[in-house]
Curated annotation (Swiss-Prot):
Subcellular location(s) per record: Secreted; Host cytoplasm
BP-aspect Gene Ontology terms: defense response to fungus; killing of cells of another organism
Role: Antifungal protein that acts as an inhibitor of growth of human pathogenic molds and yeasts.
Pfam families (alphabetical): Antifungal_prot (PF11402)
Disulfide bonds: C42-C70, C49-C77, C62-C88
Name of the protein in its database record: Antifungal protein B
Gene that produces this protein: pafB
């Protein structure tokens, strides 16, 4: 009976040691995704989104489909650097 008690405690301890622990890196990945979005302004003439990153202006092309083009000149747009996507029809 004594050996079974030790075995139960031993297996319980092994389960506790082997169970995964949530790390902070999961939270950091989610934070990095949020920090990778940059707001900018649309150019209706060129159908581009110009946003400021690191003190420099970056220009990306908006989509050519009707639901991806700029709505109006100087309309707010958003570039997601993590997913490499631009949204030129972002509501203000």
């Amino acid at each position: 009976m004594h050996i079974t008690s030790i075995a139960i405690v031993f297996f319980a301890a092994m389960g506790a040691v082997a169970s995964p622990i949530a790390t902070e890196s999961d939270d950091l990945d989610a934070r990095d995704v949020q920090l990778s979005k940059f707001g900018g302004e649309c150019s209706l003439k060129h159908n581009t989104c110009t946003y400021l990153k690191g003190g420099k202006n970056h220009v990306v092309n908006c989509g050519s489909a009707a639901n991806k083009k700029c709505k109006s000149d100087r309309h707010h747009c958003e570039y997601d650097e993590h997913h490499k996507r631009v949204d030129c029809q972002t509501p203000v």
